[in-house]
């Protein structure tokens, strides 16, 4: 139990406090303008009266404080400590997938747009964010119809004898083949940037002036092109919802029900709503701390920082946060809690999105519970299969043999439970022996019962199931249900003289005949999805190992490439395909690769290409 007499000894300076349990485990990390006032608020009468505080305080045995010079330093330190220690009661966004953005380097000879994950301070222009690669690709697809920018690296384009297919589709202007002047191409680049920035009024005004000028000078084909472009832009813009008069903003909304907290972030770019993202979290503490922690964590990542961030409630450290964001961005960014007007309406809209996301999650959980209950009943399992693990083996005639483990919790993939296994003890194509090794290693590596799944599924028939039950028996694992899922088979109907496909079959220990689940039933679809995911996870790892050997063998044929330089090339580019797509200058920019060797690498990888090399 924490000694409250220590509260008066705490400094009144800004800093970070770490709440620890009796075993020294860090339970919570927070920041404060005044450490004494902030920590005292947890242990005073007001703090003890709040349910969300009582449960944390009861577990605190010690409070460690770290003094900083400014609130901004406290923000940075808090984020660093949370990422390092992952305290149980702090907001946890570590499973959050990175957003996608469009990047355009204006210093390139003919700038093009690429889809990237990380926003860097490298002088390039960034547009977005987009919540998925698919939405980013769709944005690019629309943009190419309006502004036919090049699609591929210049080195790739110039190796071809003729323009690419996108030129024939009028979605590329083929600058690499001189079919558009640099000045005209620069006009396309500027137009695309204005369009992505949401500055459509300026863009349309410019194009109308150019159309009028072309018509006045009897350049009617040029005027017609501008006319068609103006119409296409107007049609596209009509589909986008205008929510403010202009500018970029991120709008945060919040909705809480008990310990379930939902946050929704709306992305406003150029005054238009371009997307949103929801975060569903288990959070017991105050909403203000949730908002503050979320903003600090989210914007510490390599993401786009807008002109302003609108929040649903007052945040004590908003000034320090605004200063930190402005410093990271290189331009002023404000953090505001609007009380009225259009911006307050946007915050309210974000709150509605947060509530809708929580409702959707609750419905999914109710549906998952029903599916798991039905699965338990149909397979006569001892446990409700909240945690299901599935295993698969992948190899080609015993080469590059690997195993995979995927984990699903409450019907959803739990990526933290995924594992790859390189087969170590089996020679030749013996899938049963490989499965035995993988399962044995899984339970030897984590013998604690609290780490065991409720159900293990193996991909295969009765033979694979026998291996699973043998391993469980050998290692005295008694609290795990077992099953195998055999794929459907093609069967011949001799009477009808036709081929039919059998249903998926579930084999269980102690049963001679498999259980046949109703086709397209929710339990069968869940098992099939888990089995297919295990297969995908195994085969991609197998292909990766084969690919590494392929890369090694190809690069080893190039004079001057040894293990160190090969490793550096792979670290820099990631794959043989990307090494092959790289230009000479990009290869030469790789550490330990001089220009002469870069030239040799480029020629070796392109010696069979058609057409003249540049």
Swiss-Prot record:
Segments forming a coiled coil: none
Q: Which GO terms describe its molecular function?
A: DNA binding; excinuclease ABC activity
The subcellular localization recorded is: Cytoplasm
Tell me the GO BP annotations in alphabetical order: nucleotide-excision repair; SOS response
Enumerate the UniProt keywords alphabetically: Cytoplasm, DNA damage, DNA excision, DNA repair, Excision nuclease, SOS response
What is the role of this chain?
The UvrABC repair system catalyzes the recognition and processing of DNA lesions. UvrC both incises the 5' and 3' sides of the lesion. The N-terminal half is responsible for the 3' incision and the C-terminal half is responsible for the 5' incision.
Per the similarity annotation, which family is this?
A: Belongs to the UvrC family.
Name of protein: UvrABC system protein C
What does the record give as the organism's lineage? Answer: Bacteria, Pseudomonadati, Thermodesulfobacteriota, Desulfuromonadia, Geobacterales
Name the gene.
uvrC
